[in-house]
Regions:
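Gly/Pro-rich cap/lid or specificity-loop segments adjacent to the active site
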Residues: 42-43, 63, 70
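Conserved beta-strand termini and adjacent loop/short-helix elements that scaffold enzyme active sites
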Residues: 16, 66-68
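Loop/turn elements at helix/coil->beta-strand transitions in domains of secreted/extracellular proteins
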Residues: 8-12, 60-64, 82-83, 90-91
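General secondary-structure edge motif
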Residues: 32-36, 65, 72, 94
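C-terminal, non-catalytic tails of nucleotide-sugar-dependent glycosyltransferases
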Residues: 52-55, 62-63, 122-130
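Structural microenvironment flanking redox-active thiols in thiol-disulfide oxidoreductases
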Residues: 1-59
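Thiol-/selenol-based redox modules, centered on thioredoxin-like
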Residues: 69-143
C-alpha cells in the first residue's frame, strides 16, 4: 500500500511539481523516452500546469498536487530539484528533510516517521482466493 493511502486520514499530503528534471531541450534521459515522459522545459506557467495535469491524469495520481511558480520559489525554499521529501509539522516547522533524489530519496524514512507519530499501519496478509466451483479439481477415483 502507498504511504498516502495508509496515512491520508491522519496527515496532509502535497506534491509540488518544480522545474522539469530531464527536459527534451536540456538533459533528456533514455528512461524518459522509454516511459513516454518527454517534455521541453516549461517557459511559462501554462506549460508547467499542462505537464502537471498530464501527469496526474496519466498516472491517476491521488495526492493533492501543486505547481511551483516560474520564479521557482518552492524549489528555492526547499531545495526540491529534482525530487525531495519533506514533513512539515502542525506548527509549520520542518520535521523531516529527505535527501535529494533519486540517490538519497527514501520514502521508507517518511513512512517510519509517520508510523512513529501516528502508529504503524498493518495490512492483513492477503488470503489465497478460494477456487470457484468451475475451477475446483475433480475428485480422483480410487481404485
Amino acid at each position: 500500500m502507498s504511504i498516502f493511502n495508509d496515512y491520508k486520514d491522519r496527515a496532509e499530503f502535497l506534491t509540488v511539481y518544480v522545474r522539469e528534471a530531464h527536459p527534451t531541450d536540456e538533459w533528456q534521459m533514455k528512461s524518459n523516452i522509454k516511459d513516454d515522459v518527454c517534455y521541453a522545459q516549461p517557459r511559462n506557467l501554462s506549460d508547467r500546469l499542462a505537464i502537471a495535469n498530464d501527469f496526474t491524469k496519466r498516472y491517476k495520481y491521488p495526492v493533492p498536487f501543486g505547481v511551483d511558480d516560474m520564479n521557482n520559489a518552492a524549489n528555492d525554499a526547499y531545495a526540491a530539484w529534482p525530487e525531495r521529501l519533506y514533513i512539515i509539522d502542525e506548527n509549520g516547522k520542518i520535521a523531516y528533510r529527505g535527501g535529494n533524489g533519486p540517490f538519497k530519496y527514501y520514502p521508507s524514512e517518511v513512512r517510519a516517521w509517520l508510523a512513529a507519530r501516528y502508529g504503524e499501519v498493518r495490512h492483513p496478509e492477503a488470503k489465497p482466493a478460494e477456487p470457484k466451483a468451475a475451477e475446483a479439481k475433480p475428485e480422483q477415483k480410487k481404485g
